[in-house]
């Protein structure tokens, strides 16, 4: 989903002046939001249908990663659509990594290990309040600490690793 959103946002930006391309971390947040929204409403409806009245909450979840994680030097996570050789060359010219796949080329990004879940206290508070919590969607929004700020990382965190950290 993130690759699809990233491609769509960037294609739109290319075709319309005044619109900038969306960073990978923003696309991760969009993916988390729309999937979380659908899950939250689906779970809520099913609970009500069964006579269970329990709040369901989706938490946009940022997950810190180490900026020196080896994964940033050897990207392997395939995202986006299949491209032609010319499109792949253009991606590489922009500083992105691509790999050859059946039928063409695809973009690859880093898949660093998750370090910490930024919103863990909010997630725990919602669970303590007996809510059903949807968190770490898509592996979380990868961020790096930069002073007092969090900066989005151009990466995708493996869902299993983020969920393991959440557990």
Short names for language-model regions:
Residues 1-5, 65-67, 141-143:
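Short, active-site-adjacent cap segments at secondary-structure transitions
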Residues 24, 77, 141-146, 153:
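A sequence-level detector of short, solvent-exposed, charge-rich linear segments
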Residues 106-110, 118-119, 142-145, 151, ...:
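Generic, ordered loop/turn and secondary-structure boundary motif
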Residues 125, 149-167:
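Gly/Ser/Thr-rich active-site loops/lids in small-molecule metabolic enzymes
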Residues 59, 133-137, 142-144:
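Short, conserved beta-strand edge motifs with alternating hydrophobic and charged residues
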Residues 69-72, 144-148:
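A short secondary-structure junction signal
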Residues 6-8, 147:
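Short secondary-structure transition/capping segments
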Residues 10-133:
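Ligand-binding beta-strand-loop-alpha-helix segment within the catalytic cores
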């Amino acid at each position: 989903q993130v690759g699809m959103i990233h491609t769509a946002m960037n294609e739109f930006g290319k075709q319309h002046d005044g619109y900038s391309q969306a960073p990978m971390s923003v696309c991760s947040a969009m993916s988390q939001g729309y999937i979380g929204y659908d899950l939250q409403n689906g779970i809520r409806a099913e609970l009500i249908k069964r006579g269970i009245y329990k709040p369901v909450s989706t938490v946009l979840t940022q997950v810190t990663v180490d900026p020196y994680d080896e994964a940033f030097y050897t990207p392997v996570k395939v995202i986006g659509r299949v491209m032609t050789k010319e499109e792949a060359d253009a991606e590489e010219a922009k500083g992105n990594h691509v790999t050859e796949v059946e039928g063409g080329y695809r973009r690859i990004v880093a898949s660093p290990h998750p370090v910490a879940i930024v919103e863990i206290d909010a997630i725990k508070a919602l669970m303590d309040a007996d809510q059903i919590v949807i968190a770490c969607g898509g592996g979380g929004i990868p961020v790096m600490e930069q002073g007092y700020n969090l900066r989005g990382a151009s990466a995708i965190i493996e869902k299993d690793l983020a969920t393991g950290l959440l557990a």
